[in-house]
């Protein structure tokens, strides 16, 4: 038996934030990131709508990029003191991911990260609170997914938590929030969304339920990402919806080694998640094409790329990704990103071992061992061809 899970309600469109005034509840904890939502006036809007709904609100502010276990535990403690019946997270992937993990430890203070680090080990939630997510970036799609990524900086380990219990109850996908993204963030989050859609389409758990969502997302991202990077508002809106569709796909089909690699190098080398995915994606497509040639070729055909054979179509898809990276000033290798060679050599065995153990590796369409993972990392560092 397989399962397909989404939030109960997704409100979308410009101005959909207003839906918050219809929320039923008594107390809400609002979890925020670095301050951009306040600067652009969206926090005041949310507070105003929640006041109309008669809901008392407290804020948790300053969730850092790649949130830490410490941030999660502090937030969970504040929730236990305030006892909200709604947890509302607004911002990029980081505050929403952090709020999901806070939710777990708010409802289950006896648990530790070791208890929930394996997929589908999160206990039942919603005994104390429901969860509403409002994304401001067009990439992570954590507003519709069963995932949350939390970092333990002391051990340099990223925990990709995975459980349908942490799928939000409500998502508000208002593209006005995404209009505030700077170009670099637009590029990184957009490539994250493209990676989500492509990996979901070839993942071992892809299905007739996830394939249309993934393919529609790929088509929309192909059409709108670069225009969005250049600041086109209509393209920003379409990218906000595309990343959400990609999220619905990968939350159910799961991902692959592009994300495994990004998780582990994000923790060790501090590469922004979307940037890491963008760098790895061409190399991973090449590696996986040994077993998924037809699936990748189908993507290339659907977006009208050149090629008379499956091999030529897949090469066109790889070149499309490379061209997008180039146009949006994303490095093509880890060396170009700025990681020193000796540091890479010192850490490559560690990150290879950890990437093999990542939750996303199991659903990659081509299975691999630590030595093969290391070889891919080396190809990505030096920019050499994946020919194995």
Swiss-Prot record:
Top-level taxon of the source organism: Bacteria
Keywords: NADP, Oxidoreductase
Molecular function via GO: alcohol dehydrogenase (NAD+) activity; metal ion binding
InterPro entries per record: ADH_Fe/GldA (IPR001670), ADH_Fe_C (IPR056798), ADH_Fe_CS (IPR018211), Alcohol_dehydrogenase_Fe (IPR039697), NADPH_BDH (IPR034802)
EC nos: 1.1.1.-
Pfam families attached to this UniProt entry: ADH_Fe_C, Fe-ADH
Family: Belongs to the iron-containing alcohol dehydrogenase family.
Role according to the record: This enzyme has activity using butanol and ethanol as substrates.
Family annotation (PANTHER family): ALCOHOL DEHYDROGENASE (PTHR11496), HYDROXYACID-OXOACID TRANSHYDROGENASE, MITOCHONDRIAL (PTHR11496:SF83)
Protein name: NADPH-dependent butanol dehydrogenase
Organism: Clostridium saccharobutylicum
Lineage of origin: Bacteria, Bacillati, Bacillota, Clostridia, Eubacteriales
Gene: adh1
